[in-house]
């Protein structure tokens, strides 16, 4: 328990989703007798409305929050893990990755079976656009993917207003905001804000590395008692799966907006050794030296399994397997 009477200051963006995520962390701390308070931070991604790929998507939602950590105005930064750059900050550390939310994506506005030629689907993520277009090509459908940004409610409103026919959003964010109610695991049809929706199967849409996970980042100089209070929220399985996914992404030298979808599952644990499976989909645009891919196969798919005591290293190794199998592996980006 934190011995100081001062509450732990939780810093995050001011968006409704960020606040909801802070509320979850605050409740988890309170359950352990640890008081906390919210400190809002405005990030570059909040004030620049351009597509993330244009403003340098890596870290645009976390830079200002990290600066607040370094300045000592907050004790803990509450991030969506997928937004964190894979390159670690030497003066900061992720003290906890709490239990992970649903890692799937949700199509809002219609079901996959309802998609037809000319349907406009909104997303701001190259990963989602890549997989949507790949699915549509295999289904013989000519979809139009429309770039959209904004918070969850803003993007849902674009469907209600008719600006787009559907949008794709993360199930985790929808659940944390109370927009997505529980459904039978065998069912994928649901309703979001009175709109028809479908929870997408992993065979259609793989998540971003770390999707659905929170990262509780602290300064390495944080006091021992506060560090311990935060570390108590760590979930070993969530950490292992997320680290493996992010190791895979890092080894591909891809930023967090790169067209890479990855899912790692811890199948079993034997002592300190983890039995892991990895499934990935990679946009060919990431592999710049690869010759023109066949039209029937616009993305690279990869599956692997193995054992390792170090999830990050497992992800790095599997990315190496992908790159070594390419006919002309790309040179590292400078």
Report the location of each language-model feature.
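Helix N-cap/beta->alpha junction signal
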Residues: 14, 62, 125-126, 171
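Short, structured active-site "lid" loops
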Residues: 50-76
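Small-molecule-sensing regulatory modules
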Residues: 2-42, 47-50, 54, 138-334
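A conserved helix-loop-strand patch within extracytoplasmic ligand-binding domains
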Residues: 81-84, 88-143, 214, 223
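Short, Asp-centered acidic motifs that coordinate Mg2+ and/or phosphate
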Residues: 74-78, 165-166
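Short, small/hydrophobic-residue-rich motifs at membrane-helix boundaries and re-entrant hairpins
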Residues: 19, 23, 58, 71, ...
């Amino acid at each position: 328990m934190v011995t100081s009477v001062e509450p732990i200051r939780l810093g995050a963006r001011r968006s409704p989703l960020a606040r909801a995520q802070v509320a979850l962390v605050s409740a988890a701390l309170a359950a352990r007798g640890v008081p906390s308070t919210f400190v809002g931070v405005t990030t570059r991604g909040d004030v620049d409305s351009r597509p993330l790929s244009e403003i340098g998507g890596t870290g645009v939602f976390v830079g200002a929050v990290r600066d607040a950590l370094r300045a000592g105005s907050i004790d803990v930064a509450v991030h969506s893990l997928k937004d964190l750059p894979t390159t670690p900050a030497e003066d900061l550390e992720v003290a906890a990755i709490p239990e992970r939310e649903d890692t799937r994506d949700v199509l809002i506005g219609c079901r996959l079976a309802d998609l037809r030629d000319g349907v406009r689907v909104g997303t701001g993520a190259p990963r989602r656009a890549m997989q949507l277009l790949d699915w549509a090509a295999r289904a013989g459908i000519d979809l139009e993917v429309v770039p959209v940004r904004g918070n969850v409610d803003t993007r849902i409103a674009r469907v209600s207003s008719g600006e787009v026919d559907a949008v794709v959003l993360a199930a985790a964010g929808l659940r944390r905001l109370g927009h997505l109610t529980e459904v039978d695991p065998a069912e994928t049809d649901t309703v979001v804000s009175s709109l028809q929706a479908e929870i997408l199967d992993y065979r259609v849409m793989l998540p971003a590395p770390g999707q659905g996970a929170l990262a509780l980042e602290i300064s390495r100089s944080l006091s021992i008692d506060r560090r311990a209070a935060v570390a108590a929220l760590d979930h070993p399985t969530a950490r292992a799966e997320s680290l493996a996914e992010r190791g895979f992404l890092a080894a591909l030298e891809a930023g967090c907006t790169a067209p890479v979808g990855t899912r790692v599952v811890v199948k079993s644990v034997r002592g300190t050794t983890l039995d892991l499976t990895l499934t990935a989909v990679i946009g060919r645009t990431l592999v710049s030296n690869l010759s023109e891919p066949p039209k029937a196969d616009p993305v690279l798919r990869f599956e692997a399994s193995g054992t390792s005591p170090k999830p990050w290293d497992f992800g790095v190794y599997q990315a190496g397997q992908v790159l070594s199998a390419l006919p002309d592996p790309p040179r590292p980006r400078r």
